[in-house]
Amino acid sequence: MKRLFPLLTVLIVSSFLYAQNTIPPVHSDDACTDIVVGKLASVDGSVITSHTGACDECRVHVVPGRKFPKGAKAPVYWGIQNVKTPLEDYGEILGYIPQVRKTYTYFHSGYSHMNEHQLAIGESTLSQKKELRTNRKDGKQIMTVEQAMIFALQRCRKAREAVKLIGGLMEKYGFLPSCGPESEALCIADPDEAWVIEIFSVGTDWDPESGKPGAIWAAQRVPDDHVAIVPNWSIIKEIDLSKTEWFMASANYKQVAIDHGWWDPKSGKPFVWQKAYSPVPREWATSRFWLFYSTVAPNFKNWPNKKITNPYKGYDSYHQYLEDISIYPFSVKPEKKMSVQDVIAFQRSVFE
């Protein structure tokens, strides 16, 4: 029987792994790394998604599914991550969307993460170019990623359903960053498959009455025999929407880059999502890419030689040269199948 060995959520000092068994807590000071394992890349045929999250709101509680009358509205909140409010006080209401007739039971936290149908979501904040940034004060966007995660868990059973719902919500209501002014990635899994969706905002001048999408987003499926990591950085590269089993995206996924001069369709060069919308790569992202891929697939290519052989050499062993981030793939086939314990071990790693 296919099953999801689902979400490893590390919330500042606590972690919860929900499956048929409970895994002991994992502790982390701070991080926001997602690791995804396809069903043919795991030791027991499970799909694994994980999330280390340093959000303020680490309390976890169950929100039961409910039935609603026709025409009901669902509030859109700002403040879901506020740990100072009562447990079921989700903050200020920014607006409303149509409610569904029935919602599913889910685990609620600062980044809510799994529902009764084993749909699981991990989150990792990315970085976006300054021209795309917006905020609550200056923009009209109202949909934060943590709110969209809740709507997906309440309304969806499958990963690709969740991708479509979240993308649609972001387009219609506008993506409002809540972790600084930055973009977001979600690793969404069900018992059969896993997807990565990346969401970028469209600046402060967006108007919901304009008819234009209130976000730029793209999603790619992780191959069943592959693993992937999202270390607070975009990982989606070239997108082929003719391959509907593998890619999804908003209608404006190229146009915004064209409008800003970040890509010229007449140049003859392919459109690379990661390059178009991400700023200059940072070492804290490339180091995690390197550690993960050189560990799970050491012979995939000649990875940069960043291994520290002398712990006493150098003032700061982690700040080394910055390699071209394009050398790291979207995903890779691991040389050894991974278990939940392997994922936990990597999430605990401190580059020793």
Per-region residue spans from a language model:
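Long, well-ordered mid-to-C-terminal structural blocks that present hydrophobic/aromatic surfaces
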Residues: 316-352
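Intrinsically disordered, low-complexity segments enriched in Ser/Pro/Gly/Ala and basic residues
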Residues: 4, 13-14, 286, 293, ...
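Short, well-ordered beta-strand elements within core beta-sheets of diverse protein domains
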Residues: 149-155
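Alpha-helix boundary/capping residues
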Residues: 11, 166-170, 350
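Bacterial Sec-dependent N-terminal signal peptides
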Residues: 1-21
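A contiguous strand-loop segment
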Residues: 21-145, 165-318, 333-335
